[in-house]
A protein has these predicted regions:
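N-terminal FAD cofactor-binding segment of flavoenzymes
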Residues: 3-67, 164, 172, 345, ...
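Predominantly flavin-linked oxidoreductase catalytic cores and closely associated redox partners
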Residues: 5-11, 19, 89, 93-94, ...
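Active-site-proximal substrate-binding core of FAD-dependent oxidoreductases
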Residues: 7-13, 297-303, 315, 319-368
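Ferredoxin-type iron-sulfur electron-transfer modules and their immediate structural context
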Residues: 50-56, 61-65, 347-439
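Helix-loop-beta segment of a Rossmann-like dinucleotide-binding subdomain
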Residues: 69-90, 97, 230-232
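Glycine-rich phosphate/pyrophosphate-binding beta-alpha loops
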Residues: 85, 295-308
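Flexible, glycine/charged-enriched surface loops at secondary-structure junctions
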Residues: 257-269, 328-335
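FAD-binding beta-loop-beta segment adjacent to the flavin cofactor pocket
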Residues: 269-297, 301, 426-439
Length: 439
């Protein structure tokens, strides 16, 4: 439509660099997806055409104890009528096919090392050399040197605390009112014999009272279930282990009845930006660069949503880039319309209404629940003001008695080693270390 309204840009090259070997390999989510961005991006398609597994028809929310599960009314922010259960990996593969069909160049297997800059302008990226040994020397026929790729505009869509996004924010001194805080999610996909007829969310056990988080169980099909546990990284117990608690959780009757006798076929883990409205960078554009999706912090925790925000932000970025290229100007001022568009969109509207929802739980589960209820009823007006927070690493940790470790049985519960095998990780043992500790 922009092409129709504003005329064609002529021949331009658009490239997508994906660090995974194939599209979708490094994407992980629950996921229950709001389809609004699909409808906006592909208005000519019907819901049946989109890469979504099934609509949400039933849902339940439980407060858990070690042996019981008490169903509660679904909180307003967690109601998913009109949303769809999906695999984010399948979505990414489908989107990649659509992009290639439009002539966009998609390059899987190309992780990026750094930004290319001239003065304050981002002019492209440098890829990571491939096929290096432990000492950083070429090893084998698959070795490939770094490549410099230049672009009029570079869009950073690299997820939670992406290294290029963080480097650009630090370099340009772009801040947010609160620091970003994060959660860690661990997920398994199971082939099961007993079908699940609804999406399930839980809170409380197995988490301690001063940890924020909860679990999910989604039916991807009648024979496939996604189950996971997500926990804020500001938990106070220094020995807390999210993977271990997911294994413990699966022993609970609520989960065991569906998983027992089935097979765990996939495992994965990822971090999630949870800070919300006050943790979004004040500026998400610069000279030759735009940040979208999780890299910009567009996640609304109380509704467990971020995928459609990422897509909407990508659409807004594309529109502003189109205008900038038409004018032949990709400066910071020329791309400022992107940040303005997001700030005036449903993304920031939703984040603002629930701006303190996650932050309210800094004081614990019970007090946070009371505050969250008030916020839901008043659309964020009460309690008023900003709740200030520190980075997760600044929270004091305690070292009490270590929690009992679940002894994996290899059928319902699994060690981390066995779980990582199910992730499909095939990294060579002699690659350069990617974890570097500063002095």
């Amino acid at each position: 439509k922009d092409n129709e309204d504003g005329g064609s840009l002529g021949e331009i090259e658009i490239g997508v660099l994906e660090k995974a070997g194939t599209l979708g390999e490094h994407n992980l989510s629950g996921a229950v997806v709001n389809p609004s961005a699909f409808k906006e991006l592909f208005p000519e398609l019907s819901m049946e055409d989109f890469p979504l597994r099934r609509p949400v028809t039933k849902e339940s929310v439980y407060v858990m104890t070690e042996s019981k599960a008490f169903r509660i009314p679904t909180p307003p922010t967690m109601k998913n009528h009109g949303n769809y259960i999906a695999s984010i990996s399948e979505i990414v593969r489908w989107m990649g096919e659509k992009a290639e069909g439009l002539g966009i160049n998609v390059f899987p297997g190309f992780p990026v090392d750094s930004l290319l800059v001239e003065g304050d302008k981002v002019i492209g990226v440098r890829t990571t050399p491939a096929g290096l040994d432990r000492n950083g020397e070429p090893s084998g026929a698959d070795a490939m040197p770094a490549m410099d790729l230049t672009a009029q505009v570079t869009v950073l869509a690299e997820g939670t605390r992406g290294p290029l996004s963080q480097a650009w924010l630090d370099w340009q001194g772009v801040t947010s009112e609160n620091p970003q805080i994060f959660a860690l999610g661990v997920k398994e996909v199971w082939e099961v014999k007993k079908p699940l007829d609804r999406i399930i969310h839980t809170m409380a056990w197995p988490l301690p009272s001063d940890a924020f988080g909860g679990s999910f169980m989604y039916p991807l099909s009648d024979t496939e279930i996604a189950v996971g546990l997500v926990v804020g990284l500001d938990y106070r117990d220094g020995r807390f282990d999210v993977h271990n608690e997911l294994q413990r959780m699966k022993l609970h009757p609520l989960f065991r009845q569906y998983l027992e006798g089935g097979e765990m076929v996939e495992w994965g883990a990822k971090t999630i930006p949870e800070g919300g409205y006050y943790s979004v960078p004040k500026r998400r554009h610069g000279d030759g660069v735009i940040l979208v999706g999780d890299a910009a912090g567009y996640v609304e925790v109380s509704s467990l949503k971020g995928i459609h925000y990422a897509m909407h932000s990508g659409i807004m970025a594309a529109r502003q880039i189109f205008v900038a290229l038409k004018k032949g100007d990709t400066s910071e001022a020329a791309l400022a319309g992107y940040t303005t568009a997001v700030d005036q969109s449903v993304i920031m509207k939703d984040l603002k209404e629930r701006r303190n929802m996650r932050l309210a739980f800094k004081g614990g589960f019970l007090s946070g629940g009371v505050k969250a209820t008030l916020m839901s009823l008043t659309k964020g007006a009460l309690p008023g003001g900003k709740i200030s927070i520190e980075e997760d690493a600044a929270d004091t940790k305690r070292l009490g008695a270590a929690a009992d470790k679940v002894v994996p049985d290899g059928k319902l519960t699994f060690s981390k080693v066995d779980a990582v095998y199910k992730s499909g990780n095939q990294t060579r043992d002699d690659i350069p270390s990617h974890l570097l500790v500063g002095e």
